């Protein structure tokens, strides 16, 4: 509540607990915010859910991250779960959906070959090494081809969430550079953020950015840093920078 706190400390705690953080800049909004928070907490029905990733011999996991509704890096939080499998914590779930981005590297093979590169499922690890399956499973397929169009085109969902992850990163970098007095660096990073927010349809983040920069050309990422920025506006942008929007249907 208010602005007498460090954003990175609070968001770091929220990330460690697989939760979320937000700001209540105006104390008048505390009651409504607390009500929403309690409704969300009471709506959580399943606790300690893990994303289990199995990969065959020779396959390397490059990264695992949540990309919606917020960006959350999970790669370094893996716990081994048997031969070729690992669990990545996702916390408690209610009636909701989340999107994850998994990247694996497979060994070389001949043209026309196909293999199962990974199997993803949602489970609840239990004492004694047993596990409760939640019935959700996805298969990652790798195919070797010389079709340049197929091998070089990026899946629209992957492209979208790669942009959303970059958006969160450049906002953080831009605000850090602004605090450090690097005007040119901050302008470049926040300009890129405006460009990404506009391209992905992230209107909420675009509005928050507009309180920190004057937008000259959103499509080109041309902006000017505002001479005076309210501390609450800057903290709100930083706190909510990891919130994403889903791919447009």
Ranges and model annotations:
Residues 3-127:
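Acidic, polar loop-rich interaction surfaces within structured domains
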Residues 104-249:
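Long, acidic serine/threonine- and proline-rich intrinsically disordered regions
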């Amino acid at each position: 509540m208010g602005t007498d706190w460090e954003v990175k400390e609070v968001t770091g705690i929220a990330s460690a607990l697989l939760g979320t953080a937000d700001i209540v800049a105006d104390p008048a909004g505390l009651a409504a915010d607390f009500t929403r928070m309690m409704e969300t907490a009471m709506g959580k029905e399943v606790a300690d859910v893990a994303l289990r990733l199995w990969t065959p011999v020779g396959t390397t996991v490059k990264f695992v991250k949540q990309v919606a509704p917020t960006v959350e890096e999970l790669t370094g939080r893996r716990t081994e779960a048997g031969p070729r499998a690992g669990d990545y914590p996702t916390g408690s779930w209610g009636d909701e959906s989340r999107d994850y981005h998994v990247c694996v590297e497979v060994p070389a093979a001949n043209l026309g070959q196909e293999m199962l590169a990974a199997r993803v499922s949602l489970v609840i690890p239990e004492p004694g090494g047993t596990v409760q399956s939640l019935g959700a499973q996805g298969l990652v397929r790798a195919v070797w081809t010389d079709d340049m169009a197929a091998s070089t085109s990026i899946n629209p969902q992957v492209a979208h969430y790669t942009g959303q992850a970059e958006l969160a990163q450049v906002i953080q970098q831009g605000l850090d550079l602004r605090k450090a007095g690097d005007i040119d660096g901050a302008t470049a990073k926040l300009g890129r953020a405006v460009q990404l927010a506009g391209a992905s349809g992230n209107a909420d983040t675009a509005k928050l950015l507009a309180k920190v920069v004057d937008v000259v050309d959103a499509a080109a990422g041309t902006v000017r840093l505002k001479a005076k920025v309210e501390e609450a506006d800057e903290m709100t942008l930083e706190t909510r920078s990891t919130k994403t929007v889903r791919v447009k249907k």
